[in-house]
């Protein structure tokens, strides 16, 4: 099991994966104030700032809609939020409006934001720089299965051994860049 998979099983444990440096700082501050164990996963790659809106407010257990859409919901975490936004732009050029939800807190998961978006779009894609087993995708599937059965596609590391390399090369190899996410979502929709 990966470290994140083990963390998901521990009661009252918070699991976070920030999308950018703004969210990373906010997550660390929240972790210091939280009464209980917290695991924060930081990616290696530099990413653009996503959460620079004046109204941005970080809260453990709350996701953020970073792009409105009507045809498909893309739920992403960590560095994959930027990839999801890039894919959404490409999809828009094809007439597919993707709603993008940034999930920093994987546990506890903001089920309401995901379910409300799934009601609107009818399809959900998860994107994570992690195994598709036991991470964000599994948590989203659990929530939807219990409350709103919805078709879901999980984009992430399949059940294979990882490889070494630069962050950019690995993100591209495993289809986690904007082009890879675009192709997967387009095929799914």
Model-found features: residue ranges?
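A generic local secondary-structure boundary/capping motif
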Residues: 4, 15, 27-30, 61-65
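Single conserved hydrophobic/aromatic residue that forms the stacking wall/gate
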Residues: 1-10
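Structural signature of the thiamine diphosphate
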Residues: 11-53, 179-189
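Generic hydrophobic secondary-structure packing signal
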Residues: 2, 23, 27, 80-83
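Thiamine diphosphate
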Residues: 43-189
């Amino acid at each position: 099991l990966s470290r994140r998979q083990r963390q998901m099983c521990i009661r009252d444990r918070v699991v976070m994966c920030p999308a950018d440096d703004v969210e990373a700082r906010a997550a660390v501050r929240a972790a210091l104030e939280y009464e209980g164990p917290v695991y924060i996963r930081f990616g290696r790659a530099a990413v653009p700032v996503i959460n620079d809106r004046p109204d941005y407010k970080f809260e453990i257990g709350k996701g953020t809609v970073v792009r409105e859409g009507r045809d498909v919901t893309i739920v992403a975490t960590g560095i994959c939020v930027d990839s999801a936004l890039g894919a959404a732009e490409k999809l828009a050029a094809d007439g597919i409006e993707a709603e993008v939800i940034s999930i920093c807190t994987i546990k506890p998961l903001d089920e309401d934001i995901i379910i409300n978006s799934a009601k609107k779009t009818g399809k959900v894609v998860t994107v994570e720089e992690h195994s598709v087993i036991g991470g964000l995708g599994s948590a989203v599937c659990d929530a939807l299965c219990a409350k709103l059965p919805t078709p879901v596609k999980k984009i992430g590391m399949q059940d294979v051994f990882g490889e070494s390399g630069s962050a950019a090369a690995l993100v591209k190899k495993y289809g986690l860049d904007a082009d890879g996410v675009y192709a997967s979502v387009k095929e799914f929709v």
